[in-house]
């Protein structure tokens, strides 16, 4: 799980589920996916942040705009565009239009249609806001909602090596996780806390196999 902790490792709180899930999806997940032998890192719990557009049907009717036009306008407003090159003073420069959405205002200003040379923007026909995506499940830890991830090893890989690699990567990315100063002055940083670790189970299984094999070898020697 991912939790807010102080410098001594004590729980601090102060983080909402959406903030933690964002860090899990865009930082921790990609870091752990890079570990050799990892097939997938599945995020669980929290709220996935998304841009939500509440369209006004009366405004659509007044401007004679369809819902499909709104969807197309929003999709086209969220991408980078290449514009080849331009030569200045015998030097060639690459031209690129940066158009990825970074805030609510970027969507609000997207042009849906033009009526009588006047642009009709998304904000003219609806309300744009940040909100949580519809959830299909939660992660419960001690009776409280939490955010975490499940690391799935690739088929055929050595589970113990994958686990050790994940632990090493967690130590590597720990210092770069988001932090903030809470209202009481405590500095809280998101910290990865192991929820379920198969290391002990694997070690016990290996120990059981070694014991069973050694007993079988001794019995075979005695019988012979």
What function would you assign to each model-found segment?
Residues 26, 30-38, 73-80, 110-113, ...:
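Conserved, well-folded catalytic cores of nucleic-acid-processing
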Residues 34-35, 47-48, 66-68, 77-80, ...:
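Glycine-rich loops and low-complexity Gly/Arg-rich segments
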Residues 13, 17, 21-25, 63, ...:
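Solvent-exposed, acidic/flexible segments
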Residues 1-77, 185-187, 199, 204, ...:
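A structural signal for conserved, well-ordered secondary-structure elements
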């Amino acid at each position: 799980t991912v939790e807010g902790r102080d410098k001594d490792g004590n729980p601090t709180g102060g983080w909402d589920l959406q903030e933690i899930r964002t860090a899990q999806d865009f930082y921790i997940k990609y870091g752990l996916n890079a570990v050799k032998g990892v097939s997938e890192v599945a995020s669980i719990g929290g709220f996935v942040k998304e841009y939500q557009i509440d369209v006004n049907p009366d405004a659509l009717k007044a401007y004679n705009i369809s819902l499909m036009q709104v969807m197309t306008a929003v999709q086209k407003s969220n991408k980078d565009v290449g514009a080849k090159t331009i030569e200045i003073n015998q030097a060639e420069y690459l031209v690129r239009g940066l158009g990825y959405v970074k805030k609510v205002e970027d969507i609000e200003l997207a042009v849906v249609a033009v009526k009588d040379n006047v642009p009709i923007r998304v904000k003219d026909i609806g309300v744009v806001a940040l909100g949580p995506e519809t959830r299909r499940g939660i992660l419960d830890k001690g009776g409280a909602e939490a955010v975490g991830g499940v690391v799935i090893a690739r088929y055929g890989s050595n589970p113990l090596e994958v686990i050790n690699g994940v632990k090493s990567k967690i130590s590597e990315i720990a210092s770069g996780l988001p932090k903030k100063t809470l209202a009481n002055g405590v500095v809280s940083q998101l910290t990865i806390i192991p929820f379920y670790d198969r290391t002990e189970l694997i070690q016990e299984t290996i120990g059981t196999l070694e014991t069973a094999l050694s007993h079988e070898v001794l019995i075979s020697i005695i019988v012979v």
